[in-house]
A protein has these predicted regions:
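Low-complexity, glycine/alanine/serine/threonine- and acidic/polar-rich repeat/linker tracts characteristic
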Residues: 1-16, 20-23, 27-37, 41-51, ...
Length: 175
């Protein structure tokens, strides 16, 4: 009986962790200006490369800032950050192009400096993920879909509502 209680408690903890992750992805995707699906696929690729969600978020936010500032680093890599109509390309598309350039570069100070210039303090940590190139990122995204790891916007919203309801209950109970 005690083993059953322990197993149930473990299952509840795993379920709550999955709900918390979906909620966090939903909120982070809004801050980063990308879909929950795209972010959850990137999170999977990042995790396989040793980068946590916080580091990925820091790096992608820095990428967006550098794109808006028209950083020289993109020119050094021959990566276009604008569409033909002059609007900024999506950060996910630019990330793929940057990853292709990184995949073809030797590891060393130049690569690290470019990573830090584009992705801020998370840049060096993101190099293993970038070294996979856009094809590697796409393969990891497909794998995320195949193993059921990709979170959609509807699931993230449901997780957010669930956690908000729990927070309200805890507040009502004085917790």
């Amino acid at each position: 009986a005690i083993a059953g209680i322990g197993a149930a408690a473990g299952l509840i903890a795993l379920t709550k962790a999955a709900i918390d992750n979906a909620d966090e992805l939903g909120k982070a995707s809004q801050k980063m200006g990308m879909t929950v699906e795209a972010l959850s696929r990137l999170q999977y690729a990042a995790k396989l490369s040793g980068v946590e969600l916080g580091g990925l978020q820091t790096g992608m936010n820095a990428l967006a800032r550098q794109m808006a500032a028209n950083s020289d680093a993109f020119g050094q890599l021959s990566v276009s950050i604008t569409n033909s109509d002059g609007t900024l390309r999506s950060s996910v598309a630019v990330l793929g192009d940057v990853a292709d350039r990184f995949a073809g570069m030797e590891d060393g100070a130049t690569k690290t400096a470019l990573a830090l210039s584009i992705f801020g303090r998370a840049g060096a940590d993101m190099i293993p993920m970038l070294n996979a190139g856009s094809a590697g990122l796409a393969a990891m995204a497909q794998e995320s879909d195949n193993v059921g790891n990709t979170i959609d916007g509807k699931t993230a919203k449901a997780a957010e509502r669930f956690n908000d309801t729990l927070s309200k209950i805890e507040a009502t109970m004085g917790g």
